[in-house]
Amino acid sequence: MVQLNQNFIDTITQELPAHLSMDEFIAACDRPLRRSIRVNTLKISSDDFKTLMQPKGWTFDPIPWCEDGFWISYDEEEQLGNALEHIQGLFYIQEASSMLPPTALFTPSAFTTSAKWQYVLDLASAPGSKTTQMAALMQNQGLLVANEYSASRVKVLHANVLRMGASHCALTHFDGRVFGEYLYESFDAVLIDAPCGGEGTVRKDADALKHWSLDDVLAISETQKALIESAFLALKPGGSLVYSTCTLNRLENQGVCEYLKQVYGDAVQFESLSDLFDGAERATTAEGFLHVWPQIYDSEGFFVAKLTKTASVPRLQPEPKLQKNFPFTTASAKQAQGIKDYFQQDLGISLPDELIMVRDDEFWLFPHEFNAFIGRMRFQRIGIKLADNSKHGFKVRHEAIIALAGKQLSPTAKTVDVSDVEAKEYLMGRDIPLATAGKAQGEVIVCYGGAPLGMAKHLGNKLKNNLPRDLVKDKVLLLPEQTKSL
């Protein structure tokens, strides 16, 4: 049974729209969430994914605000995070409401068009559902800066970015309040899914509202105001900003947006989201925001606001000095050709036309757009690590295979396709015996269902597992095909 704090009920009763009832709200909070996923179109189309999973008993109910999002029905009780297809990065387990902010940001408006965006900021990124959704919407073009304040959550963010093959991300680890200072008016679009009271999450956390207090709401709303102001300062004139939370009270939602409007006046232009998808008007506020109560779409509670920055605004701090000692240098023509030849000739992968950078004996691939940010802020991780170079030659990195061995793979690539059982063994760190012994082939790409799993060394009679130790799984779930009853 869900625990609803009486103080919360008293407060939210005053804010609930007249056409909604408190009884329906409480009943919705007590129902379990429908299971939802988003297909990762960086690796597979939604149609192909449905074709892949329907024989395994999945049914797909489209989420109206996300073209690649679906509520799914599935008979098994196993954790889908262990599913082979999830480990491959073919889908992300993501609550339906949380797919709203990226959709709102990337929907062209009368003011902006996302087609011209080169620089996008996700101010509070972890665990990465919205970051990877935006990476898919950008189709790994431009630069997506993903920031996370919590050190432990940066690791989770990085793991999800790699799993989903998002190669144009640069990860940072800062308090979001510094971006307006360090990267003033640098981004075409900014998403801030702000830390919040989490009132909308009660359907998956029955105790989320057990200790609710107005004092806590007031305190966190002050942090949210500072974050949205920083995000607004980091936004270019003419750019779009989406502010979202998974909470329901006005102080953390409309109140934060109204604060920004009070401070910056006509430079803040609210945009209506009433036409974002069929039925959006059921959750649209007078200002044009989406205030999603759980009973409206049978989802988590959520809030989404979109605005355009119509004019430049003064910066609050002097421009910081450029930071020195950037550890990467641009690869020489000889170095760049060497790494390209290795990928093409040894692996069958054509490297995209991006910046090849070198740090010591490491070769990296950066988005061209990152050049504009060198020295302006410290980055935890940029682009993808391609390979290490030693006296024995290049050694490809796992993340490069995951990010690049899909669409860039040539017919001559050295690949070995494995069965689902063999794929499970591989992901659990085990060597794969080969049914027929043959000539050793050296480094090969291990694939399942046409998608890469990682690297192995072909020894003739077996594949020696080269999966990084930190990616070895204790459990891999093979979803069985369902037999049809007569």
Swiss-Prot record:
Known catalytic reactions: cytidine(1407) in 16S rRNA + S-adenosyl-L-methionine = 5-methylcytidine(1407) in 16S rRNA + S-adenosyl-L-homocysteine + H(+)
Gene3D superfamilies per record: 3.10.450.720, Vaccinia Virus protein VP39 (3.40.50.150)
Keyword rRNA processing assigned: yes
Family: Belongs to the class I-like SAM-binding methyltransferase superfamily. RsmB/NOP family.
Protein name: Ribosomal RNA small subunit methyltransferase F
Taxonomic source organism: Shewanella baltica (strain OS185)
UniProt binding sites for S-adenosyl-L-methionine: 124-130, 148, 175, 193
Pfam family, one: YebU_pre-PUA_dom
Location of the protein in the cell: Cytoplasm
Gene Ontology molecular-function annotations: RNA binding; rRNA (cytosine-C5-)-methyltransferase activity
Primary location recorded for the protein, binned into one broad class: cytoplasm
